[in-house]
Amino acid sequence: AVVECNLEDGSSAQCYKFTVAYQPEGLEIGPFCPSNIDEKGGIWDWDGEKAGLYRLDRDFFEMLADQGYRFYDKDGRIVISDPGSGQPPEADHTCLMATPDKDVTITMLLPIEPRMAEKALSLGTVAKVGVALDGVPIFADAPSVLDTGHLPALDVCGGHIDPGGWYHWHATSTDIATVEKTEGVAVNCALAQDASAAFGFAFDGFPMFGSLEADGSKPEGLDKCHGHMGETRLGKTYHYHASTEFPNLPTCLSGVVAENNFSTTSSTGIGSQGNTRRGPGQAMPPGFEEAAQILGVSTEDLMNALKGNGQRPNIAAAAEKLGVTEKALRSALPQPPQHAR
């Protein structure tokens, strides 16, 4: 449907409003967490020592154990928890795997006529990126193991189930084969791969494509959001391109997004109307909402400030960005789970 909407720059516009199911019919998802270290699960973009994209297998979990993050018991069984259960994990380090809820629906808003913003919108942890052509929502990085102690496993196409019960992407899934080659990881996503195809639309209304132009050439003149103006199958327009490394999504949005552009019928998780139960792998790690309240900032601003470039957050830089002292920030933040080498 076409509806009147308000954009985040204060202007009025017309938006497409549409509702989708928890997961497209016929979409194959998984695997996520393996049941033991001898099985192969999904993938994870590790941002600690020896950072990179990995399959969730024995080599990966033993590497994490060597770094002090042990996700399996003495028999090699992976410790798995459901972040949508409302109960905190019973161990310091668990592989998170939510349960789908077939009754959940998702409603989104996209501007019909995209407008460039005066300043690009930075996309921090679990920020809303857009929606794929198959109707699956797209989000930025999932919370880091370094922040929460827990691992919200992605499947081999770069998606997983939100604690609210609905599936979403954390990657340009139709071009993840390019990432597979770049990262040297056997991903084997079952989705049809096309590096030049349209993947979806960002929440500012601009289209998102794979890592190549329609003619198979590499895109030129990309800005900091990995977008540019140029000819596409949709005509000449500003558009985004996937990167060749994981996560292969825009790091910021160049256009203006609609207010309240994402909601679900779930009682928990991102976009829920009554989100009173949060846990690792949800919109915010445990204790971060309380920290934001103590500091007098929004949870989104707090997570964006703490989001590093593949390593541990720079507390001093985050404090400066938030306009608080480093001591105040360290005091407010929850302590991560202890791990021993």
Label every model-predicted segment:
Residues 146-154, 164-218:
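Short helix-loop boundary/capping segments
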